[in-house]
Amino acid sequence: MSAESMNGLHRTLYCGELHKQHEGQEVTLMGWVQRRRDHGGLIFVDLRDRSGIVQVVFSPEVDQEAFKKAEGVRNEYVLAVVGRVNGRPEGTINPNMATGEVEVYAHTLRLLNRAKTPPFYIEDNIEVDENLRLRYRYLDLRRPEMHKAMMLRHRASKSIRDFLDQHGFLEIETPMLTKSTPEGARDYLVPSRVNPGKFYALPQSPQLFKQILMLAGMERYFQIVRCFRDEDLRADRQPEFTQIDLEMSFVEAEDVMGLMEQMIAEVCSDTIGVKISTPIPRLSYQEAMDRFGSDKPDTRFGLELKDITPIAAQCGFKVFNSTVAGGGQIKGINAKGCASFSRKEIDDLTAFVAVYKAKGLAYFIINEDGSVKSAIAKFFTEEEIAAIKDKMEAQPGDLLLFVADKPAVVAASLGALRVHLAERLELIPQGMWNFLWVTDFPLLEYDSEAGRFFAMHHPFTSPAEEDLPLLESNPGKVRARAYDMVLNGVEIGGGSIRIHRRDIQELMFKALGMSQEEAKEKFGFMLEAFEYGAPPHGGLAFGLDRLVMLLAGKDSIRDVIAFPKTASATCLMTQAPDVVDPAQLAELHIRSTAPVKKSN
């Protein structure tokens, strides 16, 4: 059977739209064959399009030619069918299908295209290697759950655009080919043919351009924009990603945060029907680190960190008191009801925190009589043990876990252990949406290996006004006018009030170890622009991929991106990146020095 043309046929309804009210109507449907079943005198075809599946029946009594064609139909063939909608007979209604009350008796069938046998079934809940799915992404995207993810992404984008339009924002595109100003991840570079030896960079964000748009008097800007970072891909990162980018003039931090939480609440309502209470709770960076060991804490469960440093400072356990003497701290987590953990289970937890550079994991097992079982208990007085139990809110049957180290190591290790235990003990409630603003970040963080400060967010973040005098004398103590939005332990957006004065921006560059010459070379255009009446301004950027992933209940952003890259930044479908013709390189005055792989 050869392929036919549509030849004047026009779809009248989508497959998933058919219901009881269409009974008796003639419809024209188009889609793919999900499955075909031959029941002797009748052939049943489940026809699928992006809206869903409907059962089509071919009977020789209705049309002999259509029935004959249907005998040759196979999975994933592309069909057009014309027929009458009938209610299904008693006992054949399928409650698992949205269209399960009806079926279409076809009198016309056109084979629009044939299909090879797919390498995996086109259905949900398949056990298929992800690389195979990415290799045949066009088939993977046919699956209903992928259709739902793409539709959800579309609805989220539309909701965002509608909200921002209603609040006076202008959607303005910024350049994709721009100047390389590396201050974090590596740039993707694009050679210029007409300017030999010079390169553009693909933007890591539109940061500079959106600030310049505020200088230009646009006042409210937004863009749903592609951004690029040539970084070593950690878990669930992409070299190209989509950002909801916006900026506002004449605002304070609360103005930006207040409007953005309204927008996110509207997006949640529009896309998944979830009502978000506003205002969203605020937590300072310091409190987040102290209580949760993370600047993006998941607040759906407890297991908060408790500081026992003052209690343990004078104890007889050398590891603890020497840590305190060296400027470190001791914090713990109360794993409620986990006193029954075996030694191997505790050793596994010790190995877990070692990944985060913790040198060990001390523990107290609280026995049923309230006594403590621990190899280190002998180094503590009864009063110290009682004080620790009180601080940790310990009860019989609990397991107290402690890390003694530098504050950064304590936070990283116990913060990760907190989440690990919550997952293992199934303490994380499903269907809960805990949003949080984290504020008052440090402006800078010191890298001892590099021997200098780096911006915790980016170099254009404004210092807290009361901390400005410290920018030259004690930059590590300066707080930023920055704010991150966190959802269930995932950072979904971050922003700040920006620097809008040249003198402060130059002080910031100086604090980052940048000479005047280097600052002028990289950001001279920005510094010059500040001299022409820059308004106070601030903004924020949300990661659209991560936001949609959470809305969809997925575990990976790859499941909400149509054509994602692998962890090695490759596209398995197109085989990008790839070698190019030497003539193309010659035009660009470029020669590859990459080692040539020997063929086997």
Curated annotation (Swiss-Prot):
Reactions mediated catalytically: tRNA(Asx) + L-aspartate + ATP = L-aspartyl-tRNA(Asx) + AMP + diphosphate
Main location: cytoplasm
Aspartate: annotated segments: 207-210
GO biological process, one term: aspartyl-tRNA aminoacylation
Transmembrane helix keyword on record: no
Subunit-structure text: Homodimer.
Name of the protein described by the UniProt record: Aspartate--tRNA(Asp/Asn) ligase
Species this protein is from: Desulforamulus reducens (strain ATCC BAA-1160 / DSM 100696 / MI-1)
